[in-house]
């Protein structure tokens, strides 16, 4: 099938069918997907997001929309430079991956040390992969983020943001590369991890050696601190900070130099030596021991932790382990319905086996006490001079107490805040661990600006999200998002217009580039120079602001061209949907929302975001260490493009991870081949079929068209593929069996119509295969441009579907009886149907149940004259409870005669069971011989 794919890709390109131009007679649909960093070839994991976007674009194109699906390449920032540096350094692991996984020739690998060569080489590789997998892209609009023309657009964007007060120069904590001395964001790190910065509160515990600054996320528990933990196997540094002598881990001493200017290193001491000393709780004034614990991580905060066993499972566990649990445990937080010592109680109850168990308990205690905890009266625990202040703490919630304690400690000089990478370790692409730096005089996008947040929230409230549950993720990110460094001193990209020593970083120049796609090809077509693309030019194109005569005169661009570009922008904008992976929600996608809200009027705000999960290979995450990275182009050669497209999008819903497996991919290829063979044999079917079978098949096809359309609208590709690839296959087989059972040849004309409908439904997923079949059926048009099938809900269609479903139920029940009671082959199946008047009772029972009613209501309505009839009504009610949805639809929607509908299917039932089937009224049943009864839709089945 790979050769078929190559054939149709050439035909599409030759016919330019995916080049989209404004057409005022048609509704437009503008879709984009995050453009890639060309710092390595695509692997299977990349494929899902891009194919998802393409399938939806193809679907909307077949729905009659004028679809624009463009593509560019993201050269900005450090990802490319860092990768090129690794090649230049001779990174063995990277070179091995390039050579043995991606099969890059040695003579090319040596050239990849040049960042621009790398970017251009991998751009070409990625572009080939995109074409080979069948993405329906308008390549005229391609650009890179270091094109001077695009840079002029970014300069305009940043000037607009500064005008609005959304760019500020400030001091703020940022993720930082300690080697290259630049801020680090998600796309600057290995594994694309966003450094999550959090606050620790340092509490100063005095000792004879100096201050032990215990780092905590829970300063409100300091009243219950009965000891200090240090790691005995670690070397600690003695430093001077703010004129105070302090003891912290060596790693902490290094990291704190990025947050404070006034640090001096005075010496070192082993953790085991520290345990010979005592410390003083600065709030209670009590002397407490310094204790050894190997759970203390010297890489987290200061490497010094206070021991609060009443509220920290680790602390109680290690006291117990060290046989120190008799130390007085001080509880300061009360949770209604829980004991005073929640941490202790949970440790005793669950008996944790390892640090992972303890971590889970810690998170549980933290969550319960944070959400439900109230402060006890702590005034009796504190120094006399603090009593009056802390008297007011009784009854405070934990969040309130946390804030007040933090403020008190800082005000009294008993503590301070520091910052830490909460999801550590995070590594810069250069290989060094990221730290937090308090960055001074840095340029920030002020996402914490209340006015800007309000605009972003308004945009989110009017947006569609797929899957819908991600809306809350965007709302959460919008709430916590604050200042973000928007420029670097290293990397490729656009200089900050008012401070050119800074380069705008990669997550800041990729927020509104979708607007640039609308006119990028016009810039190329009219050979416009970067110098012509001024602030006023962009202001007019994007916002309609300015005097066109003046702009034309100043730029040398004709008014006709300017108007044409403005009109093209207005035709395509706003963006209808943005596709991406779920990892970009907390950064790129949220910044995309903020920047659109800041710059464009509401009518040009994006309409929807679709986010998909990741791709596993054989159930495991693809990684260098597992050596299971599968290059996309290699997968396309092995399985074919259409098989890969289906396998990447059909085994999970949008928000979940897809598992790409060799066996499933091969099974997809096999079913496509089976369809192909069936279609080749269509000419041999020249009969008329049976009336019931024909009507049933048409009904099933209409049902699939309706469900597929609904599922495609919601980007539910898993359900769609299940319908059009698997259900459709079973319906075709069943139809042929139904015709055979009736002694009729299948209707060839009907089968051709059905196949033509099916191939249109499949076209967005397997466009190359669909084009081939479409043309083999004698068509000369591109199926990619055909109309998506339509259908209307029909009670008649549903009737045929439900009746046949009932026939299959009878077959299933009969087969169970045969399998259970007969070793040999029986001679006949006799079906005895209940009295027709009982059908009305069943209908009443189903209606009552659907309204939440009971058996009592059914009895009151039917008023049985004797116990025997009452017993039958009770059994009918119980049957109604057990009925599946299809049988409920049948009983409620149609005035059926059970015997007649069963007689419609006797030939089919006989064919499937391999023995004659006869239908009788229950009055014909010999009760002396068979102790059976018949209920409506549950006839008595006798096998002889």
Curated annotation (Swiss-Prot):
Short sequence motif 'HIGH' region: positions: 36-46
A matching Pfam family: tRNA-synt_1
Catalytic activity: tRNA(Leu) + L-leucine + ATP = L-leucyl-tRNA(Leu) + AMP + diphosphate
GO MF assignments: aminoacyl-tRNA deacylase activity; ATP binding; leucine-tRNA ligase activity
Annotated keywords: Aminoacyl-tRNA synthetase, ATP-binding, Cytoplasm, Ligase, Nucleotide-binding, Protein biosynthesis
CDD domains: Anticodon_Ia_Leu_AEc (cd07959), LeuRS_core (cd00812)
Recorded superkingdom: Archaea
Cellular component aspect of the GO annotation: cytoplasm
PANTHER family: LEUCINE--TRNA LIGASE, CYTOPLASMIC, LEUCYL-TRNA SYNTHETASE
Protein name as annotated: Leucine--tRNA ligase 2
């Amino acid at each position: 099938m790979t050769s078929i794919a190559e054939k149709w890709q050439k035909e599409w390109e030759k016919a330019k069918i995916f080049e989209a131009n404004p057409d005022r007679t048609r509704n437009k649909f503008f879709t984009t997907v995050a453009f890639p960093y060309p710092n390595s070839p695509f692997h299977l994991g990349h494929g899902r997001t891009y194919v998802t976007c393409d399938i939806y674009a193809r679907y909307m194109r077949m729905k009659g929309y004028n679809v624009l699906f463009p593509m560019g390449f993201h050269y900005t920032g450090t990802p490319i430079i860092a990768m090129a540096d690794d090649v230049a350094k001779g990174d063995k692991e990277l070179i091995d991956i390039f050579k043995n996984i991606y099969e890059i020739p040695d003579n090319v690998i040596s050239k990849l040390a040049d960042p621009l060569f790398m970017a251009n080489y991998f751009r070409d590789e990625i572009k080939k992969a995109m074409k080979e997998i069948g993405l329906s892209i308008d390549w005229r609009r391609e650009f890179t983020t270091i094109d001077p023309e695009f840079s002029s657009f970014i300069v305009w964007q940043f000037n607009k943001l500064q005008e609005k007060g959304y760019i500020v120069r400030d001091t703020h904590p940022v993720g930082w590369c300690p080697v290259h001395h630049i801020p680090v964001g998600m796309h600057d790190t290995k594994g694309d991890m966003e450094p999550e910065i959090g606050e620790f509160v340092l509490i100063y515990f005095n000792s004879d050696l100096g201050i032990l600054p215990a780092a905590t996320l829970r300063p409100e528990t300091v009243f219950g601190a009965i000891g200090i933990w240090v790691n005995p196997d670690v070397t600690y540094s003695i430093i001077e900070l703010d004129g105070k002598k302090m003891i912290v881990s060596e790693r902490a001493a290094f990291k704190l130099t990025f947050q404070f200017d006034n640090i001096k290193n005075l010496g070192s001491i082993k953790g085991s030596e520290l345990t010979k000393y005592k410390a003083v709780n600065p709030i209670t004034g009590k002397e407490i021991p310094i204790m050894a614990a190997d759970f203390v991580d010297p890489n987290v905060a200061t490497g010094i932790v206070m021991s609060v066993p009443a509220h920290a499972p680790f602390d109680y566990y290690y006291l117990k382990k060290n046989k120190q649990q008799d130390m007085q445990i001080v509880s300061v937080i009360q949770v209604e319905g829980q004991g005073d010592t929640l941490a202790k109680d949970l440790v005793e109850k669950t008996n944790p086996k390892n640090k992972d168990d303890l971590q889970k308990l810690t998170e549980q205690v933290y969550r319960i006490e944070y959400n439900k905890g109230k402060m006890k009266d702590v005034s009796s625990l504190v120094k006399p001079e603090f009593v009056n202040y802390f008297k007011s703490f009784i009854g405070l919630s934990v969040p309130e107490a946390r804030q007040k304690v933090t403020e008190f400690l800082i005000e009294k000089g008993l503590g301070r805040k520091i910052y830490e990478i909460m999801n550590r370790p995070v590594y810069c692409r250069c290989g060094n661990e990221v730290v937090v730096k308090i960055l001074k005089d840095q340029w920030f996008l002020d996402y914490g600006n209340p006015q800007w947040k309000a605009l972003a929230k308004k945009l989110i409230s009017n947006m569609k999200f797929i899957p819908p549950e991600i809306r809350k993720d965007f709302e959460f990110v919008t709430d916590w998002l604050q200042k973000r460094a928007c420029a670097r001193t290293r990397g490729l990209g656009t200089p900050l217009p008012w401070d050119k020593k800074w380069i705008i970083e990669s997550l800041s120049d990729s927020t509104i580039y979708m607007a640039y796609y609308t006119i990028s090809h016009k810039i190329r077509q009219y050979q416009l120079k970067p110098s012509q693309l001024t602030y006023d030019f962009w202001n007019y194109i994007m916002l309609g602001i300015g005097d066109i005569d003046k702009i034309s005169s100043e730029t040398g661009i004709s008014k006709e061209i300017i108007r044409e570009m403005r009109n093209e922008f207005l035709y395509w904008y706003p963006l209808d949907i943005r596709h991406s992976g779920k990892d970009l929600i907390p950064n790129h996608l949220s910044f995309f929302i903020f920047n659109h809200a800041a710059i464009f009027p509401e009518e040009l705000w994006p309409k929807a975001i679709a986010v998909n999960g990741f791709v596993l290979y054989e159930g495991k995450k693809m990684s260098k260490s597992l050596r299971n990275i599968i290059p996309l182009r290699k997968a396309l050669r092995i399985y074919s493009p259409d098989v890969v497209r289906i396998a990447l999008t059909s085994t999970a819903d949008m928000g979940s991870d897809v598992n790409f497996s060799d066996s499933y991919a091969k099974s997809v290829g096999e079913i496509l081949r089976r369809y192909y063979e069936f279609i080749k044999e269509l000419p041999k079917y020249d009969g008329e079929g049976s009336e019931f079978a024909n009507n049933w098949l048409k009904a099933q096809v209409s049902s699939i068209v309706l469900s597929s359309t609904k599922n495609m609208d919601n980007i539910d590709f898993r359900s769609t593929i299940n319908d059009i690839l698997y259900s459709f296959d079973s319906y075709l087989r069943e139809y042929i069996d139904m015709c055979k059972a009736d002694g009729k040849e299948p209707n060839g004309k009907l089968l051709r119509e059905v196949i033509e409908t099916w191939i249109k439904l499949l076209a967005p997923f397997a466009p190359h295969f669909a084009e081939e079949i479409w043309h083999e059926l004698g068509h000369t048009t591109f199926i990619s441009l055909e109309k998506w099938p339509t259908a209307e809900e029909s009670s008649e269609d549903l009737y045929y579907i439900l009746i046949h479903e009932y026939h299959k139920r009878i077959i299933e029940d009969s087969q169970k009886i045969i399998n259970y009671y007969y070793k040999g082959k029986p001679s006949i199946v006799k079906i005895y149907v209940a009295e027709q008047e009982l059908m009305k009772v069943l209908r009443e029972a189903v209606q009552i149940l659907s309204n939440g009613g009971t058996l009592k209501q059914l009895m009151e309505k039917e008023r049985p004259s004797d116990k025997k009839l009452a017993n039958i009504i009770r059994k009918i009610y119980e049957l109604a409870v057990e009925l599946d949805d299809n049988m409920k639809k049948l009983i409620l929607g149609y005035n059926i005669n059970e015997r007649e509908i069963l007689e419609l299917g006797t030939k089919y039932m006989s064919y499937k069971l391999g023995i004659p089937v006869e239908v009788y009224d229950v009055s014909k049943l010999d009760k002396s011989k068979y102790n059976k009864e018949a209920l409506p839709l549950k006839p008595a089945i006798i096998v002889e």
